[in-house]
Design a protein with these regions (language model features):
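N-terminal flexible/basic segments that precede or flank functional cores
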Residues: 1-42
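Long, contiguous binding/interaction regions
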Residues: 29, 57, 76, 95-96
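Intrinsically disordered, low-complexity and often Lys/Arg-enriched segments
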Residues: 1-2, 92-96
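DNA major-groove recognition helix of helix-turn-helix/homeodomain DNA-binding modules
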Residues: 74-92
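Residue-level detection of the helix-turn-helix DNA-binding "recognition helix"
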Residues: 68-69
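Short alpha-helical DNA-recognition segment
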Residues: 45-65
Length: 96
């Protein structure tokens, strides 16, 4: 008898601002811009890509492209997306 599995979607588990912040903090530990762009896309899907697009004044398609592993969001896009998600960028000394 074969084991039946289904794809894991991180977006389904990002229900609270605390979960989202912890997820993005973990992604930032890898220091990988492509992974961060992808993770922001996952969070946008969890919160509703259409709503994030509307708040940022960008199309859903543009956000799907920008917030992917191949995307490279500009700083103004990054800041707008974070604001629409109810998040902000914070700077800390390395090792803090």
């Amino acid at each position: 008898m074969a084991l039946e599995t289904r794809p894991y979607d991180t977006a389904e588990h990002l229900k609270t601002p605390e979960h989202i912040a912890a997820y993005l903090d973990a992604v930032l530990e890898d220091n990988d811009p492509a992974l961060l762009a992808h993770a922001l896309g996952v969070v946008a899907r969890a919160q509703g890509m259409a709503e994030i697009a509307q708040e940022t004044g960008r199309s859903r398609e543009q956000l799907y492209r920008t917030l992917s592993e191949k995307g490279n969001p500009q700083l103004d896009t990054l800041m707008g997306v974070l604001k629409a998600m109810g998040l902000r960028l914070s700077i800390q000394p390395v090792g803090a």
